Amino acid sequence: MRKNLHYLFPVLAVLLFVGCNTGDKSQQAMDNNENVSQQMSPVTIDDSTVNGLVVYYPEFSCIDLVCEKMPSQEDTNIVFCAEAAFTHELLDEFAHSNIDGDHVSGGKRYTGAKCKDNSGAFAWFSDSTWEFVNGEYSELLDSVAAAGGMGFGQAIIIHDGESIQPLWREGVNQYRALCEKDGRLCIVDSRDEVSYEQFVEMLEAFGPRHALYMDMGAGWNHSWWRDSDGKVHEIHPIAEKSRYCTNWITFYK
């Protein structure tokens, strides 16, 4: 279901919820997030929401799927960007065919690699509406390309309030999902390293209408957002595999 955007938020409001300490690495991430929250003005904290999640609400007028090169932090029109679809192989040269699943960037549809884990998709239309799909999404991509928007496939976690859970990842990680919550788009991260099952349970408690998996892991999780003073904050540092990233969901003010 598409939703009209009729909301005026801060340039980027961040909801920070304190989770369990699972080690020095997680404690450092927690301290960094708390320092960021002190720098932001204003900061929205929802004590009624599940502990262990960090929720980013960007204020935006446009979304695109930027491919090949990560958006520059010097572009002050950007308020948030993060890796979206999976990258198929670790290649030194970029190719749209190395992005898992067909996708739409800048209003143009591209053929991507086949990916059995892509059980759904997200699309944003140039009339400021969006749609989450569970299942086949080729028709959606045709529509959003014709409308000059963007879209990509990923693993759907929650659709219309019901858990789909198609992708059970092994081990622990800091996970991320693109969500619709109370008619607003947001990016939801686990504050600490957790199992995928725990992340899904936290998302269920958070209660989004839709949740779509986003690529994470060391290097893939490098992302950033801009505060109301124009300062850029990196959520995760650049790592070895960052150079293989291929696509980023990018929110513009």
Predicted regions and their residues:
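Flexible, glycine-rich surface segments
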Residues: G148-V188
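Conserved, well-ordered active-site substructure
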Residues: F94-A113, R169, E180, R184-E193, ...
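Bacterial N-terminal signal peptides that target proteins for export
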Residues: M1-F9
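Zymogen propeptides
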Residues: N21-K114, V188-D189
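Active-site-adjacent helix-turn-beta-strand microarchitecture at beta-sheet edges
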Residues: L91-E162
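C-terminal motif of bacterial Sec signal peptides marking the signal peptidase cleavage site
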Residues: L16-G19
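Short glycine-rich loop/turn motifs
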Residues: N118-G120, V172-A177, C245-T246
